[in-house]
């Protein structure tokens, strides 16, 4: 009888334990497009002390090491790079884990969620033509193309962090009259080589701040290398780069430019929020899949300025993503800018990757024209709300039929001059 009673009590205790246990966690983004096998982003709960985080990661590292000794074949890497955004408390780590260690992580009370790492890529295609700077400074978009801007502002005093494949900082486009470069290296999550082996990042930087091809010709650009020479990387690497930017950029005088993307990611979108809350305006490419931008990151992040691409006729590029999350359409077809194969090399390519740096440069321009800098909300409002109707319109297939795209021309005057800066917006 006593035995039966004890069994009953144990059963009740077991039920009580299960009742008070936390929800069973699952890996988000598992099986998503571009998922990287056995690689994960672990997001910890906010408010954990440094000692609690260290205790957790040490325990997971020890567990992983013990399990790995019993496994055959290649072992996963274990706990890798850690991240912590002081602006919001968003923190965690990335790593490669076997199934047993992954389950231990999922069961840990310190963990908020676990996301499978995914591939991110550039958004560029090669074509011919040049016209983008003319389009952001004129309503009349007929040739010959010219660019009008406030030379006393022109991005002076601002820094744009190009989260991409790197920058050829010795390129002529970034050299000053005294022989120094406005381009510098900041962070590299890819390799130990501070160079742009692809060219994409150098092209974007040239559109932002090049002395010939740039929107903000006096801005500084910083290379944040998160993509390889092949133009791809991981969500984990991108988040690490964003973490570095959030902790090192000067609030209200900085812009982050991200001409990249991949599958929708809660972690990546959270990192966008962290950058925004750190006082850094963040501009991202919408993507080149001709789909709703709500399906990809960082384009789907609410606090990002998401940029689609138009061609020289002000038509939305056939490759551009679309949808209600697009804030701005900017020049993205046949854009000429600097390239990484030599200090004088240029190249013409297309994509929302090319549209994004036009707006990042414009954000830097607006910041430099504002006394004391400007916070991200102010710059976002400046770019997205100062609108009037552009001639012509067409229906958007992704909106209800009664809604129409009004071609909008953002036309705003710098407080320092009468030079007009224009850009097409959704």
Curated annotation (Swiss-Prot):
Annotated compartments: Secreted
Molecular function, one GO term: serine-type endopeptidase activity
Effect of residue 266 to A: In strain: XA
Leader sequence residues: 1-21
Regulation of its activity: Inhibited by PMSF, SSI, the peptide Phe-Val and by Phe, but not by EDTA.
pH effects: Optimum pH is 6-8.
Gene3D superfamilies documented for this protein: Peptidase S8 propeptide/proteinase inhibitor I9 (3.30.70.80), Peptidase S8/S53 domain (3.40.50.200)
Record bears the keyword GTP-binding: no
Result when mutating residue 378 to I: In strain: XA
Pfam families, sorted: Inhibitor_I9, Peptidase_S8
Triggers of expression: By easily metabolized forms of nitrogen, including ammonia, nitrate and amino acids, and by glucose.
PROSITE patterns: SUBTILASE, SUBTILASE_ASP, SUBTILASE_HIS, SUBTILASE_SER
Domain Inhibitor I9 as annotated: residue spans: 39-122
Coiled-coil regions listed in the entry: none
UniProt GO cellular component terms: extracellular region
EC number: 3.4.21.-
Family stated for the protein in its record: Belongs to the peptidase S8 family.
This protein's name: Cuticle-degrading serine protease
Taxonomic source organism: Orbilia oligospora
């Amino acid at each position: 009888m006593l035995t039966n009673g004890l069994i009953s009590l144990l059963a009740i205790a077991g039920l009580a334990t299960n009742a008070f246990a936390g929800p069973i966690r699952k890996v988000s983004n598992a099986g998503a497009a571009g998922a990287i096998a056995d690689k994960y982003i672990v997001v910890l709960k906010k408010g954990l002390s440094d000692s609690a985080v260290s205790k957790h990661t040490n325990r997971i590292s020890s567990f992983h090491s013990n399990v790995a000794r019993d496994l055959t074949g290649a072992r996963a890497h274990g706990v890798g790079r850690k991240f912590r955004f002081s602006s919001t408390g968003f923190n965690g780590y990335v790593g490669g884990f076997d199934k047993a260690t992954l389950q231990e992580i999922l069961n840990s009370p310190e963990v908020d969620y676990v996301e499978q790492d995914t591939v991110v890529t550039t958004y560029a295609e090669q074509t011919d033509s040049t016209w983008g700077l003319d389009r952001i400074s004129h309503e009349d978009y007929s040739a010959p193309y010219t660019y009008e801007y406030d030379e006393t502002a022109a991005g002076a005093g601002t820094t744009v962090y190009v989260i991409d494949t790197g920058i050829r900082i010795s390129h002529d486009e970034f050299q000053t009259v005294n022989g120094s470069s406005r381009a510098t290296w900041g962070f590299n999550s890819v390799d130990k080589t501070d160079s742009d082996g692809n060219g994409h990042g150098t092209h974007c930087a040239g559109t932002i701040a090049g002395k010939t091809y740039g929107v903000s010709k006096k801005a500084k650009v910083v290379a944040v290398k998160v993509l390889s020479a092949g133009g791809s990387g991981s969500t984990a690497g991108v988040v690490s780069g964003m973490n570095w930017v959030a902790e090192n950029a000067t609030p209200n005088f900085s812009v982050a430019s991200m001409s990249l993307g991949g599958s929708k990611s809660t972690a990546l979108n959270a990192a966008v929020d962290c950058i925004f809350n750190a006082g850094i305006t963040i501009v991202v490419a919408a993507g080149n899949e001709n789909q709703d931008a709500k399906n990809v990151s960082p384009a789907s992040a609410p606090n990002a300025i998401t940029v689609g691409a138009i061609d020289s006729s002000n038509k939305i590029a056939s490759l551009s993503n679309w949808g209600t999350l697009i804030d701005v359409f900017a020049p993205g077809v046949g854009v000429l800018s600097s390239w990484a194969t030599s200090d004088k090399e240029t190249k013409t390519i297309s994509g929302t990757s090319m549209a994004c740096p036009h707006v990042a440069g414009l954000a830097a321009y607006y910041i430099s024209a504002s006394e004391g800098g400007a916070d991200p909300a102010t710059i976002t409002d400046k770019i997205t709300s100062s609108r009037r109707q552009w001639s012509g319109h067409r229906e958007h297939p992704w909106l209800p039929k009664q809604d129409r795209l009004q071609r909008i021309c953002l036309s705003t005057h710098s407080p320092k001059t009468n030079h007009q800066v224009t850009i097409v917006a959704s």
